[in-house]
Amino acid sequence: MTERTLVLIKPDGIERQLIGEIISRIERKGLTIAALQLRTVSAELASQHYAEHEGKPFFGSLLEFITSGPVVAAIVEGTRAIAAVRQLAGGTDPVQAAAPGTIRGDFALETQFNLVHGSDSAESAQREIALWFPGA
């Protein structure tokens, strides 16, 4: 089943010049980049994107991090795109949960600075795409 998902390459991925590597892995998986933009994230967009984490102890530092530098936002399409992107990304904790061969397993060292975000469900993907790409 063809799906759409949101992928973010976070500020640490931009700073470490991993955009090409990450996009290449997505494309080699057979997925399509339907839209792509480099942007600065406002506090408002960050709060909306991470709304489910509001009130948690790490919420403030999460917003500070995602707004600390440019982000690449992409709409990725393809068969089972949501699961495929999450498999490529690897576990949220790059040391304990991300397998070698995944983006996080190969390149990340900390849970917060884990390089990429991928929507976790069809509902999340729809909501997140509407936030980052209004009208898409």
UniProtKB/Swiss-Prot annotation:
InterPro entries, sorted: NDK-like_dom, NDK-like_dom_sf, Nucleoside_diP_kinase
Catalytic residues, chain numbering: 117
CDD domains given in the database record: NDPk_I
Binding positions (ATP): 10, 58, 86, 92, 104, 114
Key words of the record: ATP-binding, Cytoplasm, Kinase, Magnesium, Metal-binding, Nucleotide metabolism, Nucleotide-binding, Transferase
Reactions performed catalytically: a 2'-deoxyribonucleoside 5'-diphosphate + ATP = a 2'-deoxyribonucleoside 5'-triphosphate + ADP; a ribonucleoside 5'-diphosphate + ATP = a ribonucleoside 5'-triphosphate + ADP
GO biological process per UniProt: CTP biosynthetic process; GTP biosynthetic process; purine nucleotide metabolic process; pyrimidine nucleotide metabolic process; symbiont-mediated killing of host cell; symbiont-mediated perturbation of host Rab small GTPase signal transduction; symbiont-mediated suppression of host innate immune response; UTP biosynthetic process
Pfam families: NDK
Cofactor or coenzyme needed: Mg(2+)
GO molecular function: ATP binding; metal ion binding; nuclease activity; nucleoside diphosphate kinase activity; phosphoprotein phosphatase activity
UniProt cross-references to PROSITE patterns, sorted A to Z: NDPK_LIKE (PS51374)
Subcellular location: Cytoplasm
A Gene Ontology term for the protein's cellular component: plasma membrane
Assembly behavior: Homohexamer.
Function text: Major role in the synthesis of nucleoside triphosphates other than ATP. The ATP gamma phosphate is transferred to the NDP beta phosphate via a ping-pong mechanism, using a phosphorylated active-site intermediate.
Family to which the UniProt record says this protein belongs: Belongs to the NDK family.
Protein name as it appears in the record: Nucleoside diphosphate kinase
Organism per entry: Mycobacterium tuberculosis (strain ATCC 25618 / H37Rv)
